[in-house]
Amino acid sequence: MATVILVRHGRSTANVSGMLAGRTPGVELDDVGTSQAIRTAERLTVVPLVAVVASPLERCEQTARHILDAQSAAPSSVVENAITECDYGDWQGQPLSLLSLEKLWSVVQTHPSAATFPRGESLAAMQARSVGAIRRWDAAIEAEHGSNAVWVAVSHGDIIKSVLADALGMHLDLFQRITVDPASVSIVRYGSTRPTVFTTNSDSGDLSWLNHSAPVADAPVGGGAGHDAALPAGS
């Protein structure tokens, strides 16, 4: 079973201004976001990636480029429209402070599976396309590169939250309980019977254990010995 590292783009100019960017063109990383993306890319250098699949929006492409440039080998680079940002419709480009006054805001917060943005996408449709794309890419990468393959998907906060909710077996109505910060790392491995979530919203720490991690089948009763159990003796 391959392993997918879900990376949110670094902080964007819209994040700083408090605007819901959505698919607005020209929204790029700010200086802090660029530094965040570089740090995440450096953190991933210990893992030989086979592919970097990214949303087509500029802030994700910029984050993906830093990851690709930091790799010693040359992972394949793919733009995937199915993991682009949610289509927020008329909400796109609006200040979050004003959107929070809309009646739909409370639906998005407490009952997101029922939320459809005006002249936009429903959160349920967003999750369906995103989860479908991640699972398709994961299966294709495992078929081509084997069960030890590790790849990255660079996407957006709500997209990654919805993928994690699916992997955790959570209803979409609970996905607002998940936090995904800019340039954070979340790690999922899809098994034959269920996904396993290793990490969520991580911005520090060694990831070299991914090079030695044994495939997950049954969950260890009691919690198991952790990542170090898969390391070679003496390491």
Put a short name on every predicted segment:
Residues M1-I5, A51:
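Extreme N-terminal starter segment of soluble prokaryotic enzymes
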Residues L104-A125, G222-D228:
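Short glycine/proline- and acidic residue-enriched helix-loop micro-motifs
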Residues I38-S106, G234-S235:
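Phosphate-coordination/substrate-recognition cap region in phosphate-metabolizing enzymes
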Residues I5, V78-E80, F198:
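General small-molecule cofactor/ligand-binding pocket signal
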Residues A2, C86-S97, A143-A149, D166-S235:
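Acidic, low-complexity terminal tails and accessory targeting/binding regions
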Residues G10, G157, S202:
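Active-site metal-binding loops of divalent metal-dependent hydrolases
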Residues M126-G157:
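GST-like fold's C-terminal all-alpha helical module
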Residues R11-Q62, H66-I67, T116-V131:
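Loop-to-helix element that buttresses phosphate recognition and phosphoryl-transfer chemistry
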